[in-house]
From Swiss-Prot:
Protein's organism: Rickettsia felis (strain ATCC VR-1525 / URRWXCal2) (Rickettsia azadi)
One GO-annotated biological process of the protein: double-strand break repair
The protein's role, per its UniProt record: Involved in DNA repair and RecF pathway recombination.
Any one Gene Ontology cellular component term annotated for this protein: bacterial nucleoid
Record InterPro entries: ARFGAP/RecO (IPR037278), DNA_rep/recomb_RecO_N (IPR022572), NA-bd_OB-fold (IPR012340), RecO (IPR003717), RecO_C (IPR042242)
Pfam families: RecO_C, RecO_N
Keyword Metal-binding: no
Keyword terms: DNA damage, DNA recombination, DNA repair
Family: Belongs to the RecO family.
UniProt-recorded name of the protein: DNA repair protein RecO
Designated gene of the protein: recO
């Protein structure tokens, strides 16, 4: 059987000399892995993590790993490799997708979101965009945070906390008596115009990390690339 789609290469593992297993996050078919052969310098350039490719997958049976071929559509390598913030953000993004999405599970809407994020990242690193990516990823995996209004009073102003149980925002007055048990809602997530302080970056990292750990990273397993990214950002801001 054959699968044809457009996708982003998110992983590449050596199998034997000049032969690799790549994992591609495709628009209409989710994650697909296949064996590729690098027979030329051109093919080595094509099979790089982050490249957007036309993807062809072939196998006798659907459950087989299959053989893959790709044609390059766009490469982001040159944009990311010269900037550590961009590179670490990119590594974190593809690592999270690889960790949290199941093989051959469709995520077509999120694919479009990813392409838009990579395009923006290639132009400029923005911490707000990165955290919004993580929030979108949580929503895509079934754990959407409602940060638009207070989960108790439904007011949309003076939001200050997030409930770890309901994943909903809480106003300052509602949350104050329980503040030691709540997560802080970073102010920059409520306004696109606000400056982002170092403390707000820590708060944002803690916020999304809590829900990743509670619902998605089982047995204390975490995405190492995300840890590297966050450590870099928090130590260089």
């Amino acid at each position: 059987m054959n699968i044809k789609d457009v996708g982003v290469i998110i992983a590449k593992k050596p199998l034997k000399e000049n032969t690799f297993i790549i994992t591609v996050f495709t628009k209409n078919h989710g994650l697909y892995s296949g064996v590729v052969k690098e027979s030329s310098k051109k093919s080595k350039f094509i099979y790089q993590e982050g490249n957007i490719v036309d993807f062809l997958w072939q196998a006798r049976l659907h459950e087989h790993i299959g053989m893959a071929k790709c044609e390059l559509i766009k490469s982001y390598t040159g944009y990311f490799i010269i900037n550590k913030a961009k590179l670490y953000a990119f590594n974190s993004v593809i690592s999270l997708i690889k960790e949290l999405f199941h093989e051959r599970e469709e995520h077509s809407n999120f694919f479009s979101f990813l392409i838009n994020y990579l395009d923006n990242l290639s132009k400029n690193f923005c911490f707000r965009d990165y955290i919004n990516f993580e929030l979108a990823l949580l929503a895509e995996t079934g754990y959407k945070l409602d940060l638009t209004k207070c989960g108790v009073t439904h007011v949309t102003t003076d939001l200050n906390y997030v409930s770890p149980k309901s994943a909903r925002a809480l106003s300052y007055e509602v949350g104050k008596p329980y503040k030691d048990k709540l997560l802080i809602l970073p102010k920059f997530l409520l306004s696109d115009d606000s400056e982002i302080t170092l403390e707000e970056k820590r708060q944002a990292s803690t916020l999304t990390n809590y829900f990743f750990n509670r619902y998605l990273f089982h047995n204390n397993r975490q995405a190492e690339a995300r840890q590297i990214f966050m450590e870099y950002i928090l130590n260089n801001s």
